[in-house]
Amino acid sequence: MASDDRPLALTLGDPSGIGPEIALAAWQLRGERGVPPFQLIGDPEFLEATAYRLGLSVPVAEVEPDDACEVFPRALPVLPLPSGAKVIATPGAPDSANAGAIVESITAAVDLVRSGAASAVVTNPIAKFVLTRVGFAHPGHTEFLAALAAREGREPPLPVMMIWSDTLAVVPVTIHVALRRVPELLTQDLVERTARIVHADLRARFGLEHPRLVLSGLNPHAGESGTMGTEDRDVLAPAVAVLRSEGIDIRGPLPADTLFHERARATYDVALTPTHDQALIPVKTLAFDEGVNVTLGLPFVRTSPDHGTAFDIAGKGIAKPDSLIAALRLAHRLAHRPADTVLPFPVRA
């Protein structure tokens, strides 16, 4: 299969959430919204039943990996789970009985990309509590994908979560951890490694020749010279100094409360923040329906919608597919970007 003909591999996500219905909606809008060919890895009968229940005119076709692009114009290609597992799910009622299928879909998507049968992985939302009940040991999707990406006998790569939109791109240095643990986890080494990966992937994946980064402070006023906490002075500032000595264009630590207004955003390409919510609050405020989660640092392209399972609205036919469509489109563009082009990024000054 020629590389340009490879479809995206879309995971099932939690079948009790909105993932299946936004996948169906994305296929319906394929022409109108320029959705690239994708195959969903799951249970074809479940997807067919979901479409029927929602009153969607979406034909579902069971496919082999090589058939997806040929089938995509006329039906939603669904690749059965390798185990042949069937999915039984009630919208809004997460069930650990589906944990195996959820994990198997993710693993199969990565295997498709690594074998060359798919160009990139796009993941539908999962609920970690559903998986931890059956022994899932990873903090989230991002960390699990890093483990899958590890070569045998080697440590998993450091996965970096970037939330991208046309308005703002952000990277939390610490991800799915309790706030009280951030000071112990926020080391100079972690900041440096994260920034290096962001810098390298902006160049390699997005085609930005000279990426501009900023780092927000952890404490109010970026610590104000140590009077409001010492992490900014003793951890973040030294990390920035080392990175700048390596030729990376990064500024900081800067007060987080003045980092995300329009004029400030025009001065950088990506903002790194010490905590998860420092990054996600501004980007979800500015681009709630259009944000895309891009995992940097992996040997393959992975994107996902910037929202969760939304169990509260699952099955009601009101979930918007916008973020999933943005994730599919960005994954395709990243996987197929010509070497001499630059992908659109938040507006530069």
From Swiss-Prot:
It is found in: Cytoplasm. Keywords: Cobalt, Cytoplasm, Magnesium, Metal-binding, NAD, NADP, Oxidoreductase, Pyridoxine biosynthesis, Zinc. A divalent metal cation binds at H176, H221, H276. It comes from the Bacteria. Transmembrane segments: none annotated. Its EC number is 1.1.1.262. Substrate binds at H141, T142, K284, N293, R302. It catalyses: 4-(phosphooxy)-L-threonine + NAD(+) = 3-amino-2-oxopropyl phosphate + CO2 + NADH. Binds 1 divalent metal cation per subunit. Can use ions such as Zn(2+), Mg(2+) or Co(2+). Pathway: Cofactor biosynthesis; pyridoxine 5'-phosphate biosynthesis; pyridoxine 5'-phosphate from D-erythrose 4-phosphate: step 4/5. One of its GO terms (cellular component) is cytoplasm. Its cofactor is Zn(2+); Mg(2+); Co(2+). Catalyzes the NAD(P)-dependent oxidation of 4-(phosphooxy)-L-threonine (HTP) into 2-amino-3-oxo-4-(phosphooxy)butyric acid which spontaneously decarboxylates to form 3-amino-2-oxopropyl phosphate (AHAP). Homodimer. NCBIfam families: pdxA, PRK05312.1. Belongs to the PdxA family. This is 4-hydroxythreonine-4-phosphate dehydrogenase. The lineage of its organism: Bacteria, Pseudomonadati, Pseudomonadota, Alphaproteobacteria, Hyphomicrobiales.
